[in-house]
């Protein structure tokens, strides 16, 4: 925003130009019809051309072909399900595992109410939300890495 020059609407010369319909370069071009009718189709066609060009020039295979007669030793979910998969795998009681997964969104919902007295947007001035974010990220990465290891090393990652 610091690069864009904001118009001084108290300037009588600018007001006179605006009254005549001139001077639109002073405050930018209107979105309709310039951007919507002309720029959006150009951008969409450019992205489409890049996609088609890349798919023709570099037709890479997505993974290895499936073999219906060979079963993998351990079936793993997609990478974004690794933390929840590992959590369900290491907790012996499945009800406790499901409740622990349900406690994550419930805990995140309570954070704004705990910090409702704090009106700052700076994350360093909101210690509870920042701590919850950092601890949650570290735990999720830890559980995600542990999901790719055997069950005996799933929590310790073989470090301890």
Curated annotation (Swiss-Prot):
Transmembrane segments in this chain: where?
Answer: 36-56, 95-115, 127-147
Please list the disulfide bridges. Answer: none
GO molecular function terms listed in the Swiss-Prot or TrEMBL record: electron transporter, transferring electrons within cytochrome b6/f complex of photosystem II activity; electron transporter, transferring electrons within the cyclic electron transport pathway of photosynthesis activity; oxidoreductase activity
- The UniProt entry lists the main location of this chain as plastid
> How is this protein positioned relative to the membrane?
Multi-pass membrane protein
Give Gene Ontology CC terms: chloroplast thylakoid membrane
Q: Where in the cell is it found?
A: Plastid, Chloroplast thylakoid membrane
Q: What keywords is this UniProt entry annotated with?
A: Chloroplast, Electron transport, Membrane, Photosynthesis, Plastid, Thylakoid, Transmembrane, Transmembrane helix, Transport
Which Pfam families does the entry link to? Cytochrom_B_C
Picking any one GO biological process from the record gives: photosynthetic electron transport chain
Going by the entry's taxonomy, the superkingdom of the source organism is recorded as Eukaryota
Q: Tell me, in a sentence or two, what this protein's role is.
A: Component of the cytochrome b6-f complex, which mediates electron transfer between photosystem II (PSII) and photosystem I (PSI), cyclic electron flow around PSI, and state transitions.
Q: Which family does it belong to?
A: Belongs to the cytochrome b family. PetD subfamily.
Mind telling me what this protein is named?
A: Cytochrome b6-f complex subunit 4
This chain is encoded by the gene named petD
């Amino acid at each position: 925003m610091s690069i864009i020059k904001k118009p001084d609407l108290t300037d009588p010369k600018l007001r006179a130009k605006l009254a005549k319909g001139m001077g639109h370069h002073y405050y930018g071009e209107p979105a309709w019809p310039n951007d919507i009718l002309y720029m959006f189709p150009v951008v969409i066609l450019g992205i489409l051309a890049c996609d088609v060009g890349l798919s023709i020039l570099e037709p890479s295979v997505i993974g290895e072909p499936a073999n219906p007669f060979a079963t993998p030793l351990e079936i793993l979910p997609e990478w974004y399900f690794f933390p929840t998969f590992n959590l369900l795998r290491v907790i012996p009681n499945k009800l406790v595992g499901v409740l622990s997964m349900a406690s994550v969104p419930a805990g995140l919902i309570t954070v704004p109410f705990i910090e409702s007295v704090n009106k700052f947007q700076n994350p360093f001035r909101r210690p509870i939300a920042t701590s919850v974010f950092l601890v949650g990220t570290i735990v999720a990465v830890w559980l995600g890495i542990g999901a790719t290891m055997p069950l005996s090393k799933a929590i310790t990652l073989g470090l301890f």
